[in-house]
Swiss-Prot record:
Name assigned to this protein: FHIP family protein AGAP011705
Similarity field: Belongs to the FHIP family.
Compositional bias ranges of the Polar residues kind: 1-13, 806-825, 868-888
Region (Disordered): 1-39, 797-927
Pfam family of the protein (one): DUF5917
Domain of life: Eukaryota
Positions with biased composition (Low complexity): 889-906
Stored InterPro entries: FHIP, FHIP_C, FHIP_KELAA_motif
Length: 1023
């Protein structure tokens, strides 16, 4: 956990005064007790029974101790004299705490208040003031005396709640002590006590806001009396004393940030505090300059030791102290933007943009060295996944789209260009970054990347444009994606179906029906999974589980639609006049700050189109219920095996006009300008982003496996948006495109032809594909069990620190041991009670175990959610779901479920987190441990790890290209065939996911139509 989650700050926001009393001082006080050191007031933290104390005897003893201490004060200072005063103060505070304990007891109404003679004597005789005046004259013992005074005030403030703060004999010397601490450098023990006392004061003021003005103005008077060099303006001394400690490491920095954040929250309740912080304090410049300084300390080049590394995880943050400090500072800025006064918030955002993003992060991203580019983009991706406040997200988007700050080029355009990089590391980091940006669900990002190139709809021939907003063609697209799977995969699926008792592995299509008889050599397909102790007749792996794809797709689509409903504009194709078309590409260019006047439709129309999530009513249903809904709805549209009749379609369009801007009847082809479209045939560009994506997809069969995972995951993420214009090029094979590059569906057909040509339907090909599938399933269970062991180790308190040695285990045991650094830091974890699903357990299939390097800048292989992170981890989360392309790792929720399963029955069937939000996606981040590659070669499967710790032999390292797939131990097939087999399995899974997404998008649109129709008033009948 980060400082924000491990501190008492969260409780202090909502903790009442009574709770504070019962707790006896709060967590900060507890920390102060444990760190008091020897001697002094630390001895007051000894157990005592207040019920056995005689109040009269206590008072007499209190007076005697003070008299003896005062006699020492009158003499010259010496070591023994100072020690004697401290000893007497120790006993006096003990007696005061006993008395305060009596006073704080609950009493019945009408009963007299318990007497407090010691406290009255303390206040009436101005003992604290005399003690302060003596302390400033103690010379070389001044710091020791100040330390004891800070301990004294800390104990009294924490145990007396707010009673003492209203008494001038207590408040005046306290303010003098604080005022004299300004612009001073103290030893660490004095600094610690000072920050703890300031934290205690902030907690008390937060719980008793009515005391703030008294404290604030009393501070002003004290400052003026001491001739402070603050120009004579009012001064909130608690806040000004905390600023120097905001970037400190360890508990001291945590305490200071807690207290500063409480002051920021107080600024919402008291205008004086807000005005002081925004006008007179230096907190915003200090935060931003400190953030930039901490960023400059990060490694300029990350040492990457595995081929599949693509993002910084929470374990990486923990292992690198410089990165931990940077993330603490960034998270604190995020928290300040969340709770602070509007003036403070806006000032901090301006400083962050002008003082960090533009001068620090921009040049870092624009470096020319590939290693530096990878590091800078990984840091930027971490920043995007970590921030949650809309204000911070807005300035990040502004940073990406700014053309003036970087010599006329935009950061977003530079990132798009890097998608074409031949360096797999840079490409994977870039794809991961774009996935994080898409997880923001930001209108401006979508507009700049794609929508502004699609709004005119010139990429669709005139004769097909009327189809864009129609729903019924989606039903045909569902089977289209299932039918274009490679022939070898159809054969394998048929074999698996027969070997598993006739149960089809995809559960959704009969496309594989009618395949020729299975040859004898292929009868072993599927049987080699039994060594995991799983029932092969029940679909033991999430590979090819169509029901899980449906569940995952529905949840992610609902989540994405909910975010997109907040957009300022509705991006649906409509016939517009040229006057309206002129400004269309500039719609929503200002993002969250844009208004409805730039929309394609009126704000009233936008609000009318905003509906509840269409699948709420079936949100708790299974994937089979989703199939039933789809089946029933599609039967209403068109009878099975028949084409829809035009009168029926027109009648349906009349009933559901509200779901789109314009209906088919209002778009006669004859009214369109043909000349402009004819000249645009074959020359229309879909934009550099989609062009780069299509170009990368065309090299699918030669790409690195992990590049393909991120590439297909990113494309799947695009299909989740409720944008028919985007669906027209992704999910609608019935709509041709006139772009200057091959369409998405043409590329898919080309890939199918390549795989069919190079991997024909032969016995050898079947065996190679069987090996590829077995490798992916082995990988799935190995990673699931590795994370399961990590959770069990953490729960039992046996989790080992560091990562300098490797733990070995045989893969046949399915529960390899591992190491992971123990850490409480988690800046991406978000709590969310949303429904979880099984889909994230898919993610294990194509993720890898990592290795923990000894050198801090080295980030070994760790998987995290490639879709977001978010929300999820993250963070985030995150947060994430399974995309066969994104094949994400299991979420903590799922990991906890695996923890309660036996090793022989570890299955990832249900309960795992899917991509419901950025925050949830950050939760899905998983950290994998260091393992010896030589120990994972059971069953012919090699661990894809490129790092061996000091305890292992360097000869165990595999060739990097071999690490990519882990199939080098197989003697069947060439390397090209093995790569094609992996690609074929991946393509088959991805097409299933696209089919599921298409089906759920259709259900979503149909449900929306039904809701729109139900909300329409009934038509009036003629009288």
């Amino acid at each position: 956990m980060s400082w924000l989650r491990s501190s008492p700050l969260r409780q202090s926001f909502s903790k009442s005064g009574n709770n504070s009393n019962s707790n006896g001082g709060g967590s900060a006080n507890d920390r102060s007790r444990s760190g008091a050191g020897g001697g002094g007031l630390s001895s007051v933290i000894r157990p005592f029974d207040a019920t056995e104390c005689d109040p009269k005897a206590c008072y007499d003893s209190f007076c005697i101790h003070w008299q003896q201490a005062y006699e020492i004060i009158q003499r010259s200072e010496s070591h023994d004299d100072v020690l004697g005063v401290v000893t007497h103060l120790d006993h006096m505070v003990t007696l005061l705490l006993v008395e305060l304990h009596h006073c704080n007891k609950l009493s019945l109404p009408g009963q007299p208040t318990p007497p407090a003679p010691c406290l009255e004597h303390l206040l009436s005789e101005n003992l604290l003031d005399k003690l302060y005046e003596w302390g400033i004259k103690t010379g070389r013992y001044a710091n020791a005396v100040r330390l004891e005074q800070l301990k004294l005030y800390e104990q009294l403030v924490s145990h007396s709640r707010h009673q003492l703060l209203v008494h001038e004999p207590f408040l005046r010397p306290l303010l003098k002590l604080l005022a004299s601490s300004q612009n001073e450098i103290y030893p660490p023990d004095v600094e610690k006590r000072l920050v703890i006392l300031l934290n205690q004061l902030c907690v008390v003021l937060m719980q008793n806001v009515h005391l703030l003005d008294l404290f604030f103005f009393s501070t002003t008077q004290t400052q003026q009396s001491h001739h402070a060099s603050n120009g004579g303006h009012t001064n909130f001394i608690i806040f000004s004393l905390l600023i120097p400690y905001v970037h400190r490491e360890g508990s001291l920095g945590h305490q200071a940030r807690d207290a500063l954040l409480l002051c920021m929250a107080l600024s919402q309740k008291n205008s004086n505090v807000g005005t002081y912080i925004a006008t007179y304090s230096s907190i915003c410049p200090v935060l931003v300059t400190g953030l930039g300084g901490l960023y400059s300390r990060l490694p300029n080049q990350i040492e990457i030791k595995t081929v599949d590394w693509y993002r910084i995880t929470t374990d990486d943050v923990t292992e690198l102290p410089e990165l931990t400090l940077f993330m603490n500072s960034l998270e604190f800025c995020n928290a300040v933007v969340q709770v602070a006064h509007t003036m403070i918030r806006q000032q901090l955002l301006d400083f962050l943009y002008q003082g960090f993003l533009v001068p620090v992060l921009g040049p870092a991203i624009l470096q020319t060295n590939v290693e530096s580019q990878v590091s800078a983009m990984a840091y930027f991706d971490l920043i995007v996944r970590s921030i949650t406040e809309p204000g911070l997200i807005q300035i990040v988007i502004r940073f990406l789209l700014d053309e003036e700050k970087f010599d006329g080029q935009r950061i977003l355009d530079v990132l798009v260009e890097r998608l074409n990089s031949n360096d797999s590391r840079l490409c994977m980091v870039t794809l991961s970054l774009f996935d994080s940006l898409l997880s923001l669900n930001c209108e401006d990002i979508m507009l700049e990347l794609m929508l502004k190139y699609l709004l005119h709809c010139k990429h669709v021939p005139i004769s097909h444009r009327y189809k864009i907003n129609r729903v019924d063609p989606y039903t045909q697209a569902v089977e289209y994606f299932l039918n274009i799977t490679p022939d070898i995969m159809k054969k394998v699926n048929s074999v698996l179906s027969i070997n598993n008792g006739g149960l089809a592995s995809n559960g959704a299509s009969s496309a594989a029906a009618g395949q020729p008889a299975v040859v004898a050599t292929a009868k072993t397909i599927g049987a080699n999974w039994n060594h995991y102790g799983l029932n092969t007749t029940t679909g033991e792996t999430l590979l090819a589980n169509y029901q899980a794809y449906l569940l995952d797709a529905r949840n992610r689509i609902v989540q994405c639609k909910h975010a997109c409903d907040q957009w300022n504009n509705v991006y649906r194709y409509q016939k517009l006049s040229k006057a309206n078309f002129t400004g269309a590409p500039n719609v929503a260019a200002n993002g969250a700050g844009s208004s409805g006047q730039n929309s394609l439709v009126n704000p009233e129309d936008v609000r009318a189109l905003k509906q509840l999530d269409s699948l709420q009513s079936i949100g708790d249903s299974s994937g089979y219920e989703s199939l039933n809904v789809f089946s029933q709805t599609s039967n209403d549209l068109v009878a099975p095996g028949t084409m829809p009749q035009e009168p029926q379609l027109k009648q349906q369009q009349q009933r559901i006009d509200a779901w789109k801007v314009s209906s088919v009847r209002e778009e006669p082809i004859g009214d369109l300008d043909l000349s402009e479209d004819l000249f645009a045939q074959g020359t229309v560009s879909l934009g550099p982003f989609l062009t780069a994506i299509w170009g990368k997809l065309q090299t699918f069969t030669s790409n690195c496996l992990y590049v393909n995972l991120h590439l297909t995951g990113l494309i799947t993420h695009l299909t989740l948006f409720p944008l028919p214009l985007l669906h027209s090029i992704l999910l609608r094979p019935d709509i041709p495109t006139t772009s200057d590059t091959p369409s998405f569906h043409q590329v898919l057909k080309i890939l199918k032809q390549q795989i069919d040509a190079e991997l024909p339907d032969t016995d050898e090909s079947l065996e190679i594909v069987d090996m590829a599938r077995s490798f992916l399933v082995d990988r799935e269970f190995r990673l699931v069990n590795m994370r399961k062991n990590a959770i069990e180790s953490a729960a039992s308190g046996k989790l080992l620190n560091g990562g300098g040695s490797s733990m070995t285990s045989s893969l046949s045991q399915t529960t390899p041991m591992q190491l992971t650094p123990s850490s409480s830091y988690d800046p991406f974890k978000r709590q969310d009670g949303k429904r979880k699903s099984i889909s994230n357990s898919f993610s294990n299939i194509f993720r890898r175990p990592g290795s923990v390097g000894k050198n801090p800048p080295s980030f070994p292989s760790r998987s995290s959610n490639s879709n977001g992170l978010n929300h999820s981890p993250n963070g985030r989360q995150q947060p994430q779901s399974y995309t066969p392309a994104s094949m994400n790792v299991p979420s903590p929720v799922g990991q906890q479920q695996h923890q309660h399963q036996s090793v022989s029955s570890v299955m990832p069937p249900s309960g795992l987190l899917i991509g419901s939000s950025r925050r949830e996606s950050r939760e899905a981040e998983t950290q994998f441990m260091s393992i010896d590659t030589s120990s994972l070669q059971a069953g012919g499967i090699n661990a894809p790890s490129g790092h061996v710790s000091n305890g292992s032999n360097g000869n165990d390292l595999l060739h990097p290209h071999s690490l990519e797939h882990g199939l080098t131990s197989y003697s069947v097939g060439s390397e090209r065939q093995l790569n094609l087999a992996i690609g074929a399995v991946l393509l088959d899974e991805w097409l299933r996911e696209l089919s599921a997404v298409t089906q759920e998008q259709c259900i979503m649109m149909l449900s929306e139509q039904v809701q729109q129709q139900q909300q329409q008033p009934p038509a009036r009948t003629a009288s």
